[in-house]
Amino acid sequence: MTAMNTTPPTPSPASHFDAAARDWDQRPTSQQLAAVAPRLLAQLPLSPTDQVLDFGAGTGLLATQIAPLVAQVTALDTSAAMLEVLQAKGHANITTHCGDVFAGLPGRYHAIVSCMALHHVANTAALLRAFADALHPGGRIALVDLYLEDGSFHGDNAAKGVHHFGFAPDTLQALAEQAGLQGIAFTEVLRMHRSNGREYPLFLMTGHKP
């Protein structure tokens, strides 16, 4: 008789975020990240006719700030509960889409934005190729994530679906250029304070599709 495996299954990243969705906006991390949107928008030209994809949109940290400036925002995330919180905010021109980026994106975009989602995707090269394919010619990216760190930012990395402990700009730039993106530039956009007493810098990576 085969012994039963009593090891509890590791929760999926989506289930982690589903469980956290209700009070996500009130968490210290989210309140610090609220400073990102205006700094990102200062470096991302947008027009009232633009279609924008917010990758890893969560409860709408970026989407809700971008929506008044453009025609439509598609908020993509794997957590249905996070997107439900976003929907409840009542922005008529934000469409939510729960699914995997590699299952196909629901449109073409003039800009793709993201905040603290890249490190949740194992294959960064494939992700950047998907972004490039989904952009109109001349379309722009504005992506925020951690500079390289030692894994202490999240702590419980497996439970939270963390595949990368931040990124080295030169490595990320090379992958973006291989995906067909140009004009890649990095600026430090925020320093986050964590309960372990440390600060972690975040970058804003910008670029465009020729």
Where are these regions (language model features)?
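Conserved class I S-adenosyl-L-methionine
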Residues: T2-L46, L61-L62, V85, L190
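Short glycine-centered segments of the SAM/dcSAM-binding site in methyltransferase folds
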Residues: Q51, G139-R140
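Short catalytic micro-motifs in class I SAM-dependent methyltransferases
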Residues: M116-A117
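Class I SAM-dependent methyltransferase SAM/SAH-binding core
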Residues: L53-A103
